[in-house]
Amino acid sequence: MFGKGGMGNLMKQAQMMQEKMAKMQEEIARMEMVGESGAGLVKVTMTGAHTVRKVEIDPSLMEDDKEMLEDLIAAACNDAARRIEENQKAKMAEVTGGMQLPPGMKMPF
């Protein structure tokens, strides 16, 4: 099925892709994305590894009810996580040449 050179070349390509993916995963883990809610009144900065780095709350929200503020913080966190997922897919598509991961398979973070 494969000649000696063909199999060796295939293994070399697989190793190169694995190295590129590892490098890309490190890059993704270091990146930061900002999620927003309430038209920018609440902002959450999250790393590619889904660690929340910073929460910014507009002072005008401190006078409103606690439950609404909690909802806005949760929405901003979810927005940041969604942006990270989109960015990860785009970055990995660069490495894999647009080849999609199988459904349900996620990045190892």
From Swiss-Prot:
Subcellular location(s) of the protein: Cytoplasm, Nucleoid
GO cellular component terms, A-Z: bacterial nucleoid; cytosol
Signal peptide: none
UniProt keywords, alphabetically: Cytoplasm, DNA-binding
Any one GO molecular-function label of the UniProt entry: DNA binding
One Pfam family matching this protein: YbaB_DNA_bd
Subunit structure: Homodimer.
Family, similarity comment: Belongs to the YbaB/EbfC family.
NCBIfam families: DNA_YbaB_EbfC (TIGR00103)
Chain's role: Binds to DNA and alters its conformation. May be involved in regulation of gene expression, nucleoid organization and DNA protection.
Protein name listed in UniProt: Nucleoid-associated protein Sputw3181_1707
